[in-house]
UniProtKB/Swiss-Prot annotation:
Gene3D superfamilies listed in its UniProt record: ATP synthase, F0 complex, subunit A
Role: Key component of the proton channel; it plays a direct role in the translocation of protons across the membrane.
Organism: Crocosphaera subtropica (strain ATCC 51142 / BH68)
Top-level taxon of origin: Bacteria
Protein name: ATP synthase subunit a 1
Length: 230
């Protein structure tokens, strides 16, 4: 039983290797790209709408609503980034119903890459909203002595994002595999559904936390104003 898809090597040449994490990450991206193209190529604003378009609109509206609730801001500016994160992680976990598939989210390299995307997105959105001077100034608030602590806080929450998703997906996969080997009859179907549920929940938690971090970087001006009033 492989703990992480990084340990499954399909091809190797010198220091270059093609492991399950890379292969299945490409597969997930291919499915999302092709699926998006197939669903959106015949979009219509006139009824009757296709079932695929109705399903797509429901998903997009739910993501938009969650973004609004988490950020208290207009959702459209965040929808491409947050929506992509959610759909990638969700699809990566849902495909575990296929026996040979290994979720890329079970690899620390994948979750670290996703967390790094969030780490980069936070200052981009923050600078866009409050300006580069105000954004950089918040690192030395309320005193310049706090600079190293604020930097550590930024890094630590990025690390926690990566480890949380990796740990939950990996531990769930191991638990399901162990229980299926012990009770090989009806139990596998139940545990597979449990694994899918956990995968969707973890995708939701990751993207909501990402949105909260981004929103916190954009609300610096409001916090500054609030401190002056206090």
């Amino acid at each position: 039983m492989d703990i992480t898809p990084d340990s499954i090597i399909y091809w190797q040449w010198q220091w270059i290797n093609l492991n399950a994490t890379i292969v299945f990450s490409w597969l997930v991206m291919l499915i999302l790209v092709l699926g998006s193209w197939l669903i959106t190529r015949n979009l219509s604003i006139e009824p009757p709408l296709s079932r695929w378009q109705v399903a797509l609109e429901i998903i997009v509206e739910q993501i938009r609503q969650q973004i609004r609730d988490a950020s208290q801001q207009k959702a459209d500016q965040f929808l491409p980034f947050i929506g992509t994160l959610f759909l990638f992680i969700t699809m990566a976990n849902l495909l575990t119903i296929f026996p040979v598939y290994q979720s890329p989210a079970g690899s620390l390299s994948t979750t670290a890459a996703l967390a790094l995307c969030v780490f980069v997105a936070v200052p981009i959105y923050g600078i866009k909203n409050v300006g580069i001077t105000n954004y950089l100034r918040h690192y030395i608030q309320p005193t310049p002595v706090m600079l190293p602590f604020n930097l550590i806080s930024e890094i630590s929450r990025t690390v926690s994002l990566a480890i949380r998703l990796f740990g939950n997906i990996m531990s769930t996969s191991l638990l399901v595999a162990i229980l299926i080997s012990i009770v090989p009859l009806f139990f596998p179907a139940v545990m597979t559904l449990f694994g899918l549920l956990v995968g969707v929940i973890q995708a939701y938690v990751f993207t909501i936390l990402a949105m909260v971090y981004i929103a916190s970087g954009m609300n610096l001006q409001q916090r500054k104003t609030g401190n002056h009033h206090a």
